[in-house]
Amino acid sequence: MEYLQKLKIFKLSRKVVFGIFLVIMSASVLYVDHYLPEKTMGYITGDSVKRTDKDGPISSSNPADGPTIDVYYISLTVEGGDDKDVLVLRNEDTRSSWPFYFKYNSADLYALAQKYSKSHQLVMVNHYGIRSPYFSWFPNLTNIEPAAAGDSTTSLWRCFFNLLHIAIWLYVGFKLFMFTLKIEDNID
């Protein structure tokens, strides 16, 4: 009877371990995917500058209470989409902090965006991050370059790191499964 109780407890704990493993793996994949560069092709339709502090854009409801910086925002109409398929990008220097893009040229990119906006040129923008209107999150722009109408938006680095990351997690999951099988054999 004691053997059956141990086996039931082990099988339940194995499900819990794999549940925790899946949660950690999913969070890790989303985290890595968030910081990998992504390419989007479209037309720059607008730009703006907002003075911000650590709490976000400065306004009458959020007065400045510390050091402030200018954050550039660039609007992009995505190529091949309808008029509602737009993307707003934050254009902020990362300097030498996380993520390590070592980006110091936000003012230069802002000037390029204004140039391409006036000439209505098709551009390819590189960015990382996600857009969430609920949390006021914007992807951060890392590069702007002119594009032609058949250019690919596929990023080989993004594909490589996503596949590598998933392969590592599959390996860890396989090792975890084999370890639990060994423990189950020892219970028998």
Task: Please annotate each region the language model reported.
Residues R14-D33, W169:
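Hydrophobic membrane-insertion alpha-helices, especially the h-region
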Residues L4, R131-H165:
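Membrane-proximal loop-to-helix boundary features in eukaryotic membrane proteins
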